[in-house]
Amino acid sequence: YGLMDTSSIDAVNATNITSQPFLNSKGQGVIVGIIDTGIDYLSENFCDTAGNTRIMAIWDQTLEYRQNLYVNYGRIYEQAEINTALEAYRNGLNPYDYVGTTDITGHGTFMAGVIASRKIDDYIGVAPEASIVCVKLKNAKKYLRDYFYIRDDAVCFEETDIMLAARFLKDYAGLKKMPLVIYMGLGSGLGSRTGGSPLSNVLDSLTMHVNTCVVVPAGNEAVKRTHFSGYASVVPEYKEMEINVERRGKGFVLEIWAKSLDVLSVSIISPTGEIIPRIPARIGSSTQYSFLLENSRIYVDYQITETVAGQEVIFMRFERPAEGLWKIDVYSLTNLPGYFNAWITLKELMDCDAYFL
């Protein structure tokens, strides 16, 4: 999972709501749980008018473990500790001696400001009186970044850490007996979009509880040409996908999701015209193919991953893809319409420059 866009609250007209005196809807008595890159707790945006922090807790997954009631890794700082750090900062001392968490990228702080900044100058958040609980996610492990060909300098997180962050926020709000709104400023270019992933199931289960709401972004990849859809025809006919690689890199990942109970298979044509004939759709099979002229390699896996939907997914890893036009021909092996969707890695995570034509 990678970071999503940071856009203005003017698009939802939120400032008009907070300015209505008869509504008095400013987030008071509600916890906003933020799952992101952390938060700059020194910012006055997150303090009340008395100068005390509105941040009730920060769970920094990247720090050394300190025993607590909620989780078994990372460190949790409570509101009293944050106020102590603020007082030290105002007195010219080092606040990080007391609360050692930072937001290096600023993404989490920005989103927290959009949601819950108090009025400073001409700016105000959507819920300026809400309490804040923030989870700073740790970066994805190296073997996962290597497997998905994630760019070295990209900010990328693991699904398991996000799920545990959501569970922590729910447990914390439950202990405090306060309503909870979870905001996750993250997204992934992969997956079926059916709501059957492990993270989707966790978030769905949380929203079944009273006074719990989950907010996520959508549409950030709309114009980046990372999606393709079409109808695969019955063999020997096929639907052709074209992927243009403008800049060679470590690689990228492609997923092709079948619709309904259809079974799909693929063939591959490299930029120099080297052909890998239609690969038999043996569920659970994993095969690799080398392209000598391009010095490239493609791994092809046929999988069924969602027990509820029962959809087939063809998982393809392009390693050192040569620049030029790669063609993927998609075949249907049934008499069903053969509709499918294909997605490649998020643009901001991709080590090379590739997109659908």
For the regions a protein language model found, what residue spans apply to each?
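Autoinhibitory propeptides
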Residues: Y1-I31, G38-R54, V313-M316, P321-W326, ...
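Generic recognition of flexible, low-complexity loop/linker segments
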Residues: S19-F22, V99-G100, I120-Y123, V202-L203, ...
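Subtilisin-like serine protease catalytic core
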Residues: P21-T160, K177-M178, K250, L261-D262
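Glycine-rich, phosphate-binding/catalytic loops in enzymes
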Residues: D48-R54, S200, A232-V234
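Substrate-binding/access-modulating region of protease and related hydrolase catalytic domains
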Residues: K141-A232, G249-V263, I269-T272, S286, ...
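Non-catalytic, beta-strand-enriched accessory regions in extracellular/secretory proteins
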Residues: S233-E246, I314
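Surface-exposed loop/edge segments in extracytoplasmic proteins
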Residues: E274-P280
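A surface/secretory-pathway sequence property marking extracellular, secreted
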Residues: A281-Y289
